[in-house]
């Protein structure tokens, strides 16, 4: 099973950016924990981070025929990007949206997700564990 992991804008700043909101783990730390779990599950991961909406759309579109699912933290694009939402919908790949913080308990503008309605589900508020829970959800979904 192959899963594409996508990290959106500013996630490359984790560990130093608002640690009271996002925690002290770096993106490399999160990727390492994902790789450990993937190894246990027998899942192959491809991990990509970009601050560019177009680059993320390109990666999503290129996933068709190469991946069995997408694990995505769209970050700020969660609330603004119809392009990312449409790209995910067009792939028809099982997709889980994850967030480090609980987007529903934050500022009003952060509570709306363009991705959630077309995703298998959304996991938020569990810090780095949101990613691990999302990977397990995709794995279990694809095993059926």
UniProtKB/Swiss-Prot annotation:
One of its GO terms (biological process) is amino acid biosynthetic process. Belongs to the type-II 3-dehydroquinase family. The keyword Lyase applies. It catalyses: 3-dehydroquinate = 3-dehydroshikimate + H2O. CDD domains: DHQase_II (cd00466). It comes from Geotalea uraniireducens (strain Rf4) (Geobacter uraniireducens). This is 3-dehydroquinate dehydratase. Pfam families: DHquinase_II (PF01220). Pathway: Metabolic intermediate biosynthesis; chorismate biosynthesis; chorismate from D-erythrose 4-phosphate and phosphoenolpyruvate: step 3/7. The record marks 17 as: Transition state stabilizer. Substrate binds at residues 73, 79, 86, 100-101, 110. SUPFAM superfamilies: Type II 3-dehydroquinate dehydratase. The lineage of its organism: Bacteria, Pseudomonadati, Thermodesulfobacteriota, Desulfuromonadia, Geobacterales. Homododecamer. GO terms for molecular function: 3-dehydroquinate dehydratase activity.
């Amino acid at each position: 099973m192959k899963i594409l992991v996508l990290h959106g804008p500013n996630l490359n700043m984790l560990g130093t950016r608002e640690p009271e909101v996002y925690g002290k783990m770096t993106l490399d730390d999160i990727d390492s924990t994902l790789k450990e779990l993937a190894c246990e599950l027998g899942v192959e991961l491809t991990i990509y981070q970009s601050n560019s909406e177009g680059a993320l759309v390109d990666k999503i579109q290129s996933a068709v025929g190469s991946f069995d699912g997408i694990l995505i933290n769209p970050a700020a694009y969660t609330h603004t990007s119809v392009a990312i939402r449409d790209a995910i919908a067009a792939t028809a790949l099982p997709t889980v949206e994850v967030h480090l913080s609980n987007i529903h308990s934050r500022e009003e503008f952060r509570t709306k997700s363009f991705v959630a309605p077309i995703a298998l589900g959304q996991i938020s508020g569990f810090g780095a564990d949101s990613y691990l829970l999302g990977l397990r959800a995709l794995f279990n979904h694809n095993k059926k």
